[in-house]
């Protein structure tokens, strides 16, 4: 009698629904997944090792390139770890700016997650709407750092510069954009960055309503997500879940509330929590988080308008002196030269700093030996713990559901492979 064998299928590494270079070896019985084996490492760039050969400041841009959808949140954990070792604290205005940009980054990430997840499942319109809003938030990145993605804006002791009074303007009309459209876009960018962000926060809840109209009660969307990839609260904790993956299973754990950092303890916001622990609940948690992030951004804008002040500490052994001081004072020039050639030395010790990243708990464990470079840098990526559970979440589901589960895990391989 012929022996019945399971069928092995390679999913990726170039599959459009794989969110990067994921290779999945699926063992199938017909169309039902019996085992899912993720093969990682295809985007490994030795970030942790590279950081050991750069000064503390030079290693900062590597952080942007880990989870390349949530750039400033990665930087935040890194600079917080350095600040712990140095025993310094950023000025209050810098802390508010950091929190505001952390939440802008959270919205950026969730828009990408929501849009790509819907696209994977077969709903294309949401992806296009989400990128319409992402464009505005990318302009905020560009206004403060000059870069739309890899900002390198945070610094140990504060941020690179204060918020600008003007926004980048669009150029002349082209075959893609008429003169009227360009003028309308520039009108929204006529004030300061805070004006632009405030205008965005007024519009954004209506945009989220649009996404929910398209998806939340859509019967096809619900059929594809409800009851798929269920993880109960105890199992979620055992697997090391954090962020929306953990909260979707009904565990109200959010570092912004449980271990507040910067000025999160002064912010008024709620932590959305799921009930069933399936893909649909995780989707609802992310949508609700975008609304809460919008609330936090509004509070930051209001405070920043009324409280001018320094955005960097005054210690010129860590923070660069101003350009005018550098050109008129020899001592400041020496500080500047030493800072950008040799960098600053960090006293021996070790520190762990974690932030509530859009994907979960993103942590940096930093060991210093008194030199101007990290002795050891360990990155705790939330997606790594989530991907290991893919086998458990996908087992017994159809092959099409694997795409839904990968989408709900919100995987980005920059942080997983490092």
From Swiss-Prot:
Subcellular location: Cell inner membrane
InterPro entries xrefs: NADH_Q_OxRdtase_suD, NADH_UbQ_OxRdtase_49kDa_CS, NDH1_su_D/H, NiFe-Hase_large
EC number: 7.1.1.-
Top-level lineage group: Bacteria
Reactions catalysed: a quinone + NADH + 5 H(+)(in) = a quinol + NAD(+) + 4 H(+)(out)
Membrane topology: Peripheral membrane protein
Keywords recorded for this protein, A-Z: Cell inner membrane, Cell membrane, Membrane, NAD, Quinone, Translocase, Transport, Ubiquinone
Major enzyme class: translocase
SUPFAM superfamilies, sorted: HydB/Nqo4-like
Molecular function GO labels: NAD binding; NADH:ubiquinone reductase (non-electrogenic) activity; quinone binding
GO cellular component: plasma membrane
Pfam families named in the record: Complex1_49kDa
Subunit structure comment from the entry: NDH-1 is composed of 14 different subunits. Subunits NuoB, C, D, E, F, and G constitute the peripheral sector of the complex.
Family: Belongs to the complex I 49 kDa subunit family.
Function per UniProt: NDH-1 shuttles electrons from NADH, via FMN and iron-sulfur (Fe-S) centers, to quinones in the respiratory chain. The immediate electron acceptor for the enzyme in this species is believed to be ubiquinone. Couples the redox reaction to proton translocation (for every two electrons transferred, four hydrogen ions are translocated across the cytoplasmic membrane), and thus conserves the redox energy in a proton gradient.
Full protein name: NADH-quinone oxidoreductase subunit D
Species of provenance: Bordetella parapertussis (strain 12822 / ATCC BAA-587 / NCTC 13253)
């Amino acid at each position: 009698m012929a022996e019945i064998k399971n069928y092995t299928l390679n999913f990726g590494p170039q599959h459009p629904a794989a969110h990067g270079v994921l290779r999945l070896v699926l063992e199938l019985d017909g169309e039902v997944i019996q085992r899912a084996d993720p093969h990682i490492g295809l985007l490994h760039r030795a970030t942790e090792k590279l950081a050991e050969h750069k000064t503390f400041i030079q290693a900062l841009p590597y952080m942007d390139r880990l989870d390349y959808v949530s750039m400033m949140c990665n930087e935040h954990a890194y600079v917080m770890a350095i600040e712990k070792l140095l025993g310094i604290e950023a000025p209050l205005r810098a802390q508010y700016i950091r929190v505001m940009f952390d939440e802008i980054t959270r919205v950026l990430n969730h828009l990408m997650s929501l849009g790509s997840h819907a696209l994977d499942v077969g709903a294309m319109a949401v992806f296009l709407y989400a990128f319409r809003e992402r464009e505005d938030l990318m302009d905020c990145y560009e206004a403060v750092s000059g870069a739309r993605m890899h900002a390198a804006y945070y610094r140990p002791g504060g941020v690179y510069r204060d918020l600008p009074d003007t926004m980048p303007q669009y150029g002349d009309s082209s075959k893609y954009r008429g003169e009227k459209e360009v003028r309308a876009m520039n009108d929204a960018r006529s004030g300061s960055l805070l004006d632009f962000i405030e205008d965005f926060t007024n519009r954004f809840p209506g945009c989220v309503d649009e996404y929910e109209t398209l998806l939340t009660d859509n019967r096809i969307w619900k059929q594809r997500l409800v009851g798929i990839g269920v993880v109960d609260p105890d199992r979620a904790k055992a697997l090391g879940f954090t962020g929306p993956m953990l909260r979707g299973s009904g565990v109200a754990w959010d570092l912004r509330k449980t271990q507040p950092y910067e000025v999160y303890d002064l912010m008024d916001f709620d932590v959305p929590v799921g009930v069933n622990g399936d893909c649909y609940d995780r989707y609802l948690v992310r949508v609700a988080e975008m609304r809460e992030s919008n609330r936090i951004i509004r509070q930051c804008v209001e405070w920043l308008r009324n409280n001018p002040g320094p955005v960097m500490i005054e210690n010129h052994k860590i923070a660069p002196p101003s350009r005018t001081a550098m050109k008129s004072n020899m001592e400041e020039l020496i500080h500047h030269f030493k800072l950008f050639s040799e960098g600053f030395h960090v006293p021996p010790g070790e520190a762990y700093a974690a932030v509530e990243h859009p994907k979960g708990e993103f942590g940096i464990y930093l060991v210093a030996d008194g030199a101007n470079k990290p002795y050891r840098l360990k990155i705790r990526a939330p997606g790594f713990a989530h991907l290991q559970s893919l086998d458990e979440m996908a087992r017994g589901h159809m092959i099409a559901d694997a795409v839904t589960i990968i989408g709900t895990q919100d995987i980005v391989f920059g942080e997983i492979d490092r």
